[in-house]
Amino acid sequence: MGSRWQMEKKHDPYYKKAKKEDYRSRASYKIKQLDKKFKLIKEGDTVVDLGAAPGGWSQVALEKVGEEGLVIGVDLNRIKPFPEENFHGIRGDFTTTEVQEKVMNLIGGKAKVVISDASPSLCGIKNIDQLRSIDLTNTVIGIADNILEPKGNLVMKVFQGPEYKDMLTRLKKKYRQVKTTKPPSSRKKSSEMYVVGLDFKPKKNKKSKD
């Protein structure tokens, strides 16, 4: 199984392209294609990358935001530092309050974009894997609710399951536009999809009456 996967990887055009163009992973082309289609990241933006290791998405985000922007990558695994000083890596579980507070402190305000190519730990049992995927998706949505500025953007990996449609319905109440897509660089065999939320509409705090 391992040798077959290695052979497929070597013949993968995006794997070869990433090696040639010095990207950390073939996943870099997913966010490049998503950004080209939806104009997610602009120069000067603050971007939070959830599940960032090895850093393929953060690498592209750094290119897009330029010197005036900021990219924060979070992952359980170590993210090898980038030469750019405007990248901050956090090693930890982004589903925990402690790590989320670290992100908030680094931002010092709100983020313009939340990106996530994170996948849950899969065990091969369909029902359990779907529940884990739903939990992870809900966590990413919740973090975006807390840290996105008005009109901010979200893009995240999802796997279709029983609660997929309900999740899209909820997102449509939070963002002016919600799109689903599968970029060309996603493997055809993969069941992954990407959900894009454009123009975040934060809940307005109700003023208490005197």
UniProtKB/Swiss-Prot annotation:
InterPro entries assigned to the protein according to its UniProt record, in alphabetical order: RNA_methyltr_RlmE, RNA_MeTrfase_FtsJ_dom, rRNA-MeTfrase_E, SAM-dependent_MTases_sf
Subcellular location: Cytoplasm
Record keyword Nuclease present: no
Top-level taxonomy: Archaea, Methanobacteriati, Methanobacteriota, Methanomada group, Methanobacteria
Molecular-function annotations in GO: rRNA (uridine-2'-O-)-methyltransferase activity
Name of this protein: Ribosomal RNA large subunit methyltransferase E
Keyword S-adenosyl-L-methionine: yes
Region named Disordered: 175-210
Residues that bind S-adenosyl-L-methionine: 55, 57, 75, 93, 117
Keyword tags: Cytoplasm, Methyltransferase, rRNA processing, S-adenosyl-L-methionine, Transferase
Described purpose of this protein according to its UniProt entry: Specifically methylates the uridine in position 2552 of 23S rRNA at the 2'-O position of the ribose in the fully assembled 50S ribosomal subunit.
Gene: rlmE
Domain of life assignment: Archaea
